[in-house]
Amino acid sequence: MGRKTLCESETVCRDVTINGSAGCLQNVGPPPTNLFQPPRRPGLGTLGKPIRLLANHFQVQIPKIDVYHYDVDIKPEKRPRRVNREVVDTMVRHFKMPIFGDNQPGYDGKRNMYTAHPLPIGRDRVDLEVTLPGEGKDQTFKVTIQWVSVVSLQLLLEALSGHLSEVPDDSVQALDVITRHLPSMRYTPVGRSFFSPPEGYYHPLGGGREVWFGFHQSVRPAMWNMMLNIDVSATAFYRAQPVIEFMCEVLDVQNINEQTKPLTDSQRVKFTKEIRGLKVEVTHCGQMKRKYRVCNVTRRPASHQTFPLQLENGQAMECTVAQYFKQKYSLQLKYPHLPCLQVGQEQKHTYLPLEVCNIVAGQRCIKKLTDNQTSTMIKATARSAPDRQEEISRLVKSNSMVGGPDPYLKEFGIVVHNEMTELTGRVLPAPMLQYGGRNKTVATPNQGVWDMRGKQFYAGIEIKVWAVACFAPQKQCREDLLKSFTDQLRKISKDAGMPIQGQPCFCKYAQGADSVEPMFKHLKLTYVGLQLIVVILPGKTPVYAEVKRVGDTLLGMATQCVQVKNVVKTSPQTLSNLCLKINAKLGGINNVLVPHQRPSVFQQPVIFLGADVTHPPAGDGKKPSIAAVVGSMDGHPSRYCATVRVQTSRQETTQELLYSQEVIQDLCNMVRELLIQFYKSTRFKPTRIIYYRGGVSEGQMKQVAWPELMAIRKACISLEEDYRPGITYIVVQKRHHTRLFCSDKTERVGKSGNVPAGTTVDSTITHPSEFDFYLCSHAGIQGTSRPSHYQVLWDDNCFTADELQLLTYQLCHTYVRCTRSVSIPAPAYYARLVAFRARYHLVDKDHDSAEGSHVSGQSNGRDPQALAKAVQIHHDTQHSMYFA
């Protein structure tokens, strides 16, 4: 793929007809690393008001030395990193004289080990034997050490100062391993964070889970320096406690003595779902607390669960678990009516009574938190910006991250400064927003917020035929309350320039998800020109998923759900927000960017694409990944169309295809559909494609960008051979740990003391040569604002820093659901909404999940074709913003 840009040659003709018949080619594999180079930074931005900031990046001073890289192969394999670290630590101490001397290696827990001085083994392979004391018997490991390479920190320093075009990955990896070695030994590592058991605090989440606090740490190349990004962190762990107590928490049993009967089927299923995959340790063998992983929970209680007991004469007899524990351990079970845990391999039939098992400490909860647990977590962890700043500074200055000075850093001559990095950012000007009506009022956001009072939509939709379906019980939502709600909605909608004419043509109560489809079919057949169904919901209910499945995919009807609490107690703000969503769904335009303030990219036809991939929760092999791409359909941009696909789930991806876990597999056809629709909507062919890609981690960026760029290019060529619009590919990242703080207290904004909306940083803590920037586009309401990170991976359109930063900030003001700027550009946000909506389209309506979380997988008889059909939007809806 050549780097010919639109700056050098305009190759697109506006008046050439798009041919909609040709197909797309298949995506390609990952790029050779020497072929794909992101564009260099085009210069620093200058637009906006300067603001003095602090960032939670700490300067790392590195010496101009070589570091020696060795491969470590430990047999037996597939041991936890914690065990591998113990093996290597023991090896370094045991073989100090002949091999390691005064070296204190940094080790990553897998295969990579680094030393400050070469080991006296040259390039030979060395085989060693290491013994660790075990429970009952010692464990012996065979360790093979092999020289890999010499890693130059001198080259890294040259890259940081701009004398080399590319930052050497091997040097960054070496530094990362060395700085993480000691905390990895002392704490519980989770990803790039470290946690320790609660001391002096206790934040239960319910369901056997609790909050653990810790810190995030990662080494990052920046302008002139390496930086250590340090942040406070929190996550959910399983509480170390008896399994009996764990079960009571999961099943909401206040006291185990209340559970006098065997578990019901629903109780057992719920308990199994929570405990499967967890490690437990036994308490009936004295000091030898053997650990097992739970694979199942038995249907029968311990008093009835049997297994074949081998007798001394070689024969086997059926024995219950309760009998066995009484005979073998003289242990009379207190709760023989409760089930057993099946542990180890399922085919081996190893059973343990609940009462002899404890949950092993230090197990992170990877399963999805419930809404209540998430709410509790947020309350426990939210910190205002000044509080978070103070906490991070205290953490670093007290050396409590690593429990004191780090001998491994000292070994390599590495020094971490303990002051946050000072830098100058800029606060970008907010765009003005054009409204409609007679007055054509203009709104100017203040700190990311503006008011719609006294303003009318730029293009409001007149609603003549509409219906109301109330799924809340009549005693909760009386007819007079419904009437009051519809009257107030009509008044607010008229004020907003989206008049709802007359009373609803249909207003009835209904019950349960099963009634949704027949009711909606009746409405479609009976009321010609029906534009909208307002659905009242009684809180969390599977009805929501069914409403969206039927409305979006089956019948092509616009639906707007409202929680009953907002009907019983209405507010102008809630009703106004409903109108924002309804107008967008029906094809209206709420507001537009004032044309004369828009960047120059708008001078030619341009399409804005947003893309995202959402994955099922870890360990859930039944649910597929979902890819979504949206595209703007006008020149404002305000209207968008969506495309969505079901992708092969992560569990089905082979080792060779790991690079494509995040790649949108059918991107070529998805972009092609959007380009055709853009042409139909505008009669123009876009000469520029601006692609905002969410959901990609830092390590995946280049691997994902190459096949996706090729797919976008192929989509264009499939429409016409010489159609080559300029592509700009930008990764949008929210999942990072960079935080910005105001140096001057007077510049803090809001109750949480955050940086102002529009704060932009493209120097000091950004990449030494590549085109990236941080932008905090929203006003923080709770906790510390997280700026979004933007990394430009391809740019045919030759954006300046100011142009792209301003464009991105303006797009954050075009999100239709609220009168606030949001944290990422609208197209990227919409792609997330589309992907999450598709999850509801896959929900099995027969399942009683209040959260709509049961998604049919292939094991439920739905093959890939059926899944693809389930997320296919009805032709009457597919060109609307049904996801708004």
Curated annotation (Swiss-Prot):
SMART domains: DUF1785, PAZ, Piwi. PROSITE patterns: PAZ, PIWI. It is found in: Cytoplasm, P-body. Residues 848-870 are annotated as: Disordered. Gene3D superfamilies: 3.40.50.2300, paz domain, Ribonuclease H-like superfamily/Ribonuclease H. Residues 242-361 form the PAZ domain. GO terms for cellular component: cytoplasm; cytoplasmic ribonucleoprotein granule; nucleus; P-body; RISC complex. InterPro entries: AGO4, ArgoL1, ArgoL2, Argonaute_Mid_dom, Argonaute_N, PAZ_dom, PAZ_dom_sf, Piwi. Keywords: Cytoplasm, Ribonucleoprotein, RNA-binding, RNA-mediated gene silencing, Translation regulation. It holds the Pfam family ArgoL1. Residues 532-843 form the Piwi domain. One of its GO terms (molecular function) is miRNA binding. GO terms for biological process: miRNA-mediated gene silencing by inhibition of translation; mRNA catabolic process; pre-miRNA processing; regulatory ncRNA-mediated post-transcriptional gene silencing. Required for RNA-mediated gene silencing (RNAi). Binds to short RNAs such as microRNAs (miRNAs) and represses the translation of mRNAs which are complementary to them. Lacks endonuclease activity and does not appear to cleave target mRNAs. Belongs to the argonaute family. Ago subfamily. This is Protein argonaute-4. It comes from Xenopus laevis (African clawed frog).
